[in-house]
Amino acid sequence: MPINEALFAAMKAASYIKPNAGKSYKLQRVAEELIAKQAPDNPKCRVEDAFAPMADGYAVPLRVFTPLVAYGAPLPEALEESSANGTPVASAISAILPAVLPKVLPKIPIKESTSSGNADGISGNANTELPSVTPRGTILFFHGGGWTTGGINLYTQACAHMAVRLQRRVISVEYRLAPEYRFPTAVEDCYEVARQLFAGELPISGVGGSVDVDHPQRAAPTAPAGGGDISATIPAPDPDSIVLFGDSAGGNLAAAVSLMARDRGEFMPRTQMLLYPVVGNDYNPETSPFESVRTNGTDYILTAQDMADYIDMYRSSVADLTNPYFAPLTAHDLSNQPRTLVLSAEYCPLRDEDEAYARRLQLVNDNVSCYRIHDGIHGYLLNTSAVGLVATTYRIIEHFLDGTPLEPAPGTGTTANAPEGGDAWQDVL
């Protein structure tokens, strides 16, 4: 459907003035940390930090989100209002910050922490007066950012919202970033965290400690001394209740972890959710088999050139391009995969490859769903002004997780730009 003309003009301008990802990822990281510091705490969710040890001595930081209140009738409006009025972490703003950051950096006010928790203003004991609810399961979340940016700080607000909205504990994984750590480091980090979670070996500890924002360049971090142990409150989950979820590069990692798990036989995810995931390897408009790379690859913040840069920064060699753990769509065998939800975005350059991946999964697996989010652009999960898009996404996710049919509801939950009576999504399969 046609996107709002003013919004399109703004995105097109931002897409053209921002530097390519290969030149701006370091400034992007700084911009994201500044944005993360402005994000308000979610009073309906307990947030705690932890670490997962890797075989090479590295400790992967985790952030654990536990809902404190039920998502009841009076809560949606308050929560959506809080999201809409929160710090704007819109993709467009985030994407152009590296271009202007050197000029505005001294002028950006940094919110002083009023929390008694860690250095990021997240308290391990926040809202203890609120009654806890029993989470319905555990979501292991892998963040987006082209494998080079993003992190648990930037995604704190989104993950807290996710935990409350879905009434599930969310564990956000701070895997090591490229280009400092290239393929397969990120996917191996994510795989090992998932393995420990499924095996009941994940040592959720270090609560109240600070997660160093520069940790991707830190050789061997360790959990802070004296950190509390909350393992008693995080029992080994029922494997059937664990969901792998990732957006963008995180969706790539979730899909790759599922393929790895099938091949290695140490555990097997039952459910995965992929939000505008990276599953391909060719973003050259002249050679890509997918039309969305050409139609959506210049004007909607994430460009085809950005994707090519991310691929180059993530891969260790040309051979990686055809490794299914790098580009899941290249896998010759997609059988024995979890029940899968793929969500594509209408104006995303990855749209067609996402839907192609869902179709290939459907050929050899049961219970695969794929929906195209109308008016969606890449990265909208972090856009606090995209309330309609996020609400639509969670509505689809809720039905998928509950196993209930998703019936079209004209006029309900549609995006602001959808025609009156139109639906906010399209069933692709």
Model-derived regions, located:
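C-terminal auxiliary extensions adjacent to catalytic cores
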Residues: P2-N4
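Alpha/beta-hydrolase superfamily serine-hydrolase fold, recognizing
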Residues: A9, A14-K18, I35-Q38, R46-L429
